Amino acid sequence: MADDPFVLGGTTYASRLIMGTGGAPSLDVLERALVASGTELTTVAMRRVNASVHGSVLSVLERLGIRVLPNTAGCFTAGEAVLTARLAREALGTDLVKLEVIADERTLLPDPVELLDAAETLVDDGFTVLPYTNDDPVLARKLEDAGCAAIMPLGSPIGSGLGIRNPHNFQLIVEHARVPVILDAGAGTASDVALAMELGCAGVMLASAVTRAQEPVLMAAAMRAGVEAGRLARRAGRIPRRHFAEASSPAEGLAVLDPERPAF
């Protein structure tokens, strides 16, 4: 929407949905899902992609005019993540990086110590850093203070489809952030992304929820609609929650009936 721009790292996007590419059953399905999602920014794991291979994910993104967001998936230390980001910048000519530093393979949760270390190094090196982080308001503030261009907290573990398990923390992060907050990981269906937007997130990043759905292209369209609906609801302002009913029709003007007089 022209009156509601999504600005990330100095670039304005029409879509607030950032897509991932992992888990798609084929390049054809991935391409159709990307089109259905309306995304303009899509992540690619640089440790798993050969930028020189034609017919790859990168060639699909180039053909569709979608900007590549390299990520450091698969890195377990700050050093690995920094090296991967620098290789991505050299290969793709972009300073934009989705920073991931994972604590272990079982949970795929971020390592907060290594993440903050890598973020500080990459910001100093001129990168536009978008960190995948825990839903921790304190860590979110430290990442913002380090110079990150956005905060990307998880709603629940990667690929779990559990949605946002701690909406209160998301609200705290959104209320104090001066940069965009983007849901990253945990979405399972369109209602999850709508909730994220209603809580005040500026955007949503997802992959598995679409690529591993029974109908990826259909789910991509659903996610697009969910993001748009949630954003509109946030801007509109929901009614307050109440313990008791409140009639929507006014009491003024109701007929006063005499119980002793017949109606007809």
Curated annotation (Swiss-Prot):
InterPro entries: Aldolase_TIM, Thiazole_synthase_ThiG, ThiG. 1-deoxy-D-xylulose 5-phosphate binds at residues 159, 185-186, 207-208. GO terms for cellular component: 2-iminoacetate synthase complex; cytoplasm. Its EC number is 2.8.1.10. GO terms for molecular function: thiazole synthase activity. It is an enzyme of class 2 (transferase). Pfam families: ThiG. Its main location: cytoplasm. The active site is at residue 98. Pathway: Cofactor biosynthesis; thiamine diphosphate biosynthesis. It catalyses: [ThiS sulfur-carrier protein]-C-terminal-Gly-aminoethanethioate + 2-iminoacetate + 1-deoxy-D-xylulose 5-phosphate = [ThiS sulfur-carrier protein]-C-terminal Gly-Gly + 2-[(2R,5Z)-2-carboxy-4-methylthiazol-5(2H)-ylidene]ethyl phosphate + 2 H2O + H(+). It is found in: Cytoplasm. Keywords: Cytoplasm, Schiff base, Thiamine biosynthesis, Transferase. One of its GO terms (biological process) is thiamine diphosphate biosynthetic process. CDD domains: ThiG. Signal peptide: none annotated. Homotetramer. Forms heterodimers with either ThiH or ThiS. Belongs to the ThiG family. Catalyzes the rearrangement of 1-deoxy-D-xylulose 5-phosphate (DXP) to produce the thiazole phosphate moiety of thiamine. Sulfur is provided by the thiocarboxylate moiety of the carrier protein ThiS. In vitro, sulfur can be provided by H(2)S. This is Thiazole synthase. It comes from Streptomyces coelicolor (strain ATCC BAA-471 / A3(2) / M145). The lineage of its organism: Bacteria, Bacillati, Actinomycetota, Actinomycetes, Kitasatosporales.
